[in-house]
A protein has these predicted regions:
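Interfacial loop-to-transmembrane junctions
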Residues: 116-138
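Functional transmembrane core segments of multi-pass inner-membrane proteins
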Residues: 4-110, 149-154
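Helix-loop junctions at the membrane-solvent interface of multi-pass transporters
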Residues: 45-46, 71, 116-117, 141-142
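C-terminal transmembrane module of polytopic alpha-helical membrane proteins
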Residues: 138, 143-154
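Short, structured coil/loop segments at alpha-helix boundaries
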Residues: 4, 25, 137-138, 142-143
């Protein structure tokens, strides 16, 4: 098994743990985000020529999320922001944007369901980490083909 495959397997394990913990507690432990960031750093070390897209990936979603939190209280949790920074280091900027897109779509659909079923109100919060994790896994496994398909329309 290649190092890249082992790293992807480790990332999937971390994301599964993050999803389960966040769904139950609405918190993402820093140690999980740190483990994901270590996987990102290892992936950069395995292909050092491609380091810049990974650094941009760590910032391209997490910084706007942080800035949005400064404007809208509670827009995202700190764990969500750190999760996307760590995932961005692993994924690179293009797949990080794709992961965020899928996370927002999945989380938005769940939020609409909660509102429609009257299980939550507009001011209620729910764990967003599991949806971000789903987006990260999709981007990690299918990012290339999805981006190629999308770019064919441009």
């Amino acid at each position: 098994m290649s190092w890249a495959a082992l790293l992807a397997l480790a990332v999937c394990g971390i994301l599964l743990s993050v999803s389960l913990i966040d769904a139950e507690t609405q918190t993402i432990p820093d140690r999980m985000n740190l483990a994901l960031a270590v996987c990102g750093a290892v992936s950069v070390l395995l292909s050092p020529a491609d380091w810049l897209p990974h650094v941009i990936g760590a910032l391209c979603v997490s910084v706007p999320m942080f800035l949005l939190c400064l404007v809208i209280d509670g827009a995202f949790g700190g764990g969500d922001i750190k999760l996307m920074a760590a995932a961005g280091l692993f994924l690179g900027w293009q797949n990080t944007l794709l992961a965020m897109f899928f996370g927002i779509v999945f989380g938005g659909m769940y939020g609409i369901y909660l509102l429609a079923a009257k299980k939550a109100g507009k001011k209620d919060h729910f764990a967003f980490g599991p949806f971000l994790c789903a987006g990260i896994v999709i981007a990690m496994l299918f990012g290339g083909p999805v981006l190629e398909w999308y770019c064919a329309f441009l």
